[in-house]
């Protein structure tokens, strides 16, 4: 299976709620970086940190959170996914949609680095009851 096929499979698994399959692509030493301004901003080291710091929170704090890619750029060991986030933040009951870019770096068929790019203001509007949605 190519690196591109592996990353496509990650998004398919995430959409189905199959988090163990998402974690399986990760190297034990993965660096996973969430964008500054995103609710879970920072760099997480290792699959367990990603599970606890990102995925478990997405599952408990959001209704219908989705990350749907619409385009991939295949650079061999570097795969870029372009897509759209959507979801409703439970605490405010506010929804959002925002375009994302995810940059994946793979080594020996495992993801060693993930970097998220997103317009975090669109996300913050869902988190903050006082901020208007566009």
Question: Where are the language model's segments positioned?
Answer:
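A solvent-exposed, acidic/Ser-Thr-rich amphipathic alpha-helical stretch
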Residues: 23, 27-77
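Short, low-complexity N-terminal intrinsically disordered segments enriched in polar/charged residues
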Residues: 1-28, 128-134
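A beta-strand edge to alpha-helix "cap/lid" segment located at domain peripheries
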Residues: 55-134
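Hydrophobic pocket/interface hotspot
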Residues: 7-10, 22-26, 30, 46, ...
């Amino acid at each position: 299976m190519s690196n591109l096929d592996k990353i496509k499979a990650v998004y398919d698994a995430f959409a189905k709620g199959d988090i163990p399959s998402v974690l399986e692509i990760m190297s034990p030493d993965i660096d996973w970086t969430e964008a500054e301004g995103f609710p879970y901003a920072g760099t997480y080291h290792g699959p367990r940190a990603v599970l606890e710091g990102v995925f478990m929170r997405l599952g408990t704090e959001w209704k219908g959170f989705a990350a749907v890619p619409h385009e991939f750029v295949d650079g061999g060991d570097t795969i870029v996914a372009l897509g759209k986030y959507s979801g409703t933040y439970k605490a405010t009951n506010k929804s959002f949609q925002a375009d994302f870019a995810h940059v994946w770096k793979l080594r020996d068929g495992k993801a060693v680095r993930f970097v998220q790019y997103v317009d975090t203001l669109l996300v913050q509007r869902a988190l903050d009851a006082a901020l208007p949605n566009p």
